[in-house]
Regions:
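Structured domain cores in non-transmembrane regions
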Residues: 2-116
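A eukaryote-biased signal for long
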Residues: 83-213
Length: 213
């Protein structure tokens, strides 16, 4: 999927509106997407982005959003709505919304090397007659597994998702109001709070089975 890029400008102002529909000035927005470029025949995709966008508006890089999803040719996808997984990187103040499941931004400094284990998560909703599929890499509420970063002195970002396609966790709703049930790859199950299975348990199952991808 292409990367989403957002630049902001102090010189070219824009308008926003309050609850009384009164306008007030805000920094200008310049948002667009750009494709990654594959490096050779391997699995590395790369893009170079200018922090100083220049031009008459003196655009400055504000935020990046990198997203990926399970490809349509994977058998597990059949009959399911696939939800993308995102990372957000902020070089300035918040420019992109929090609605991408990344959690709130955590402060980091220097280059980033992000290697995360992901497990296919199937959510069955009888209420909406729908089954969704996403990649679960931990509850992004606590800081440890968040995927949004407020950057300082960062020049290079490497994202290496490790996807365990044979370690599927399934979430099923109760017959009556109550907690969801998580069914883990080893056949065990448990009631879970909110919508998050145990990431630590998934990592343990992965380790016990040799970490097969």
């Amino acid at each position: 999927m292409p990367i989403q890029i957002l630049y902001r400008s102090e010189k070219c102002m824009d308008k926003s509106y309050n609850s009384s529909f009164e306008s007030y000035p805000v920094r200008g927005y310049n948002g667009f997407t750009q494709p990654f470029v594959r490096q050779g025949m391997g699995g590395l995709w790369q893009i170079s982005i200018a922090i100083d966008g220049g031009g008459p508006c003196q655009w400055q890089l504000n935020s990046l959003r990198v997203s990926f999803r399970i490809a349509d040719n994977i058998p597990l996808v059949k009959g399911k709505e696939v939800i993308e997984t995102s990372y957000i990187f902020d070089f300035g103040d918040y420019g992109l919304s929090d609605g991408y499941g990344t959690g709130r931004a955590k402060e980091v400094s220097g280059d980033l090397d992000l290697k995360t284990d992901y497990f296919p998560e199937v959510f069955i909703s009888h209420l909406f007659n729908q089954t969704t599929l996403n990649l679960f890499g931990g509850n992004t509420g606590p800081e440890k597994w968040r995927r949004r970063f407020r950057l300082r002195n960062t020049q290079n970002i490497l994202i290496e998702p490790v996807i365990h396609f044979d370690k599927v966790v399934t979430l099923t709703p109760p017959d009556a109001p109550g907690k969801l049930t998580a069914i883990y790859p080893d056949g065990s199950s448990e009631k879970i709070p909110h919508i998050y299975p145990s990431y630590e348990k998934l990592l343990s199952i992965r380790s016990c089975n040799g970490g097969k991808r």
